[in-house]
Structures are given as structure tokens and as C-alpha cells.
């Protein structure tokens, strides 16, 4: 079930962006993607929900030249990957530069597998409504963090993982296509 077309396109897009000589008028660089440039700025990749999954996938499977410039990947409540992706060296190389944020009752962000650390954020909503980033609580210096996800989140996560593990490949593919 991996890669899906969106993941392939995300990795290609990241390579295209990384090959550009300039990012929003970087000092000392031309504005054309074909112009020579002595300064290649660092890259930060981020996304929410499916976009978080795409950000992690793209950062993992883009070119090695692009990957070397990635300083961090932020996944905001995006699903993880199956064991095949998690074991790939491309994913492992980017994993230590990846942080996933999930609300305390996360469902989406706990789907499939994650090896990167995750930070639990307090949300003013309940249940699935916590997936909305605008419900996440912030303080002066950043997110209002909690120690762990709720027991309900862990229960739903274990139940979904067990259910998905019992599916054959075509059923999993149908589930991914439906999302």
C-alpha cells in the first residue's frame, strides 16, 4: 500500500524545491531555479494529517542531496507507515530529525507505525474533533504539552492496529484508497 501516488509526488516535489537556487529571495542567489547559487538554505518539511504523512515520506524518500539539507520534519497528527517503510534505511535516516505532534485523544496520528518521538498536545476539543489544529492549546512559548495520550486513544489505536493487521493486502489498499 506504500507508496501511494501522493507520496511519490510529494518526494518529487521536495526534490524540485531542493534543486531550486533560491527560496523567496535568499540573499546572494538568483531567483531562477537554473541559476547557480553558492548558498543552499536548510529545509524544514511539515504537514498536518495526510500532509504530515506526506512530509515524512517525502523527506525519507527524496534524493540524498535534498535529504542532507533537511534539518527537521514536523508531522502534525499524521498517520505513520507499515513495517516495510519503517524498516527502510531511507526512513531511518530521517527519523531522528522528525517530530510528530498528536492531541491527547489522537486517532489519526496514531494510525499505523511511528518510530519517531511524538509530543502530546492538549486540545480544547474532544474525540476526533481534536484532529483540528485550531483546537490545540498554546502557551506563550509553544504548545501546551501533556505527558501521554489518553487511555481511550491507546485503546482505539490498539483496536485499529489489530483490525488492520487482520486485513489482506487488497483490503488494506482499499482502506488507504478510501482515506
Specify the residue positions occupied by each region the protein language model found.
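Alpha/beta hydrolase fold serine-hydrolase catalytic domain that processes acyl esters and thioesters
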Residues: 1-21, 37-42, 63-179
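Ala/Thr-enriched low-complexity intrinsically disordered regions
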Residues: 26, 31-38
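Gly/Ala-rich beta-loop-alpha elbow adjacent to hydrolase catalytic centers
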Residues: 47-51, 55
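Short glycine-enriched nucleophile-adjacent loop
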Residues: 55-64
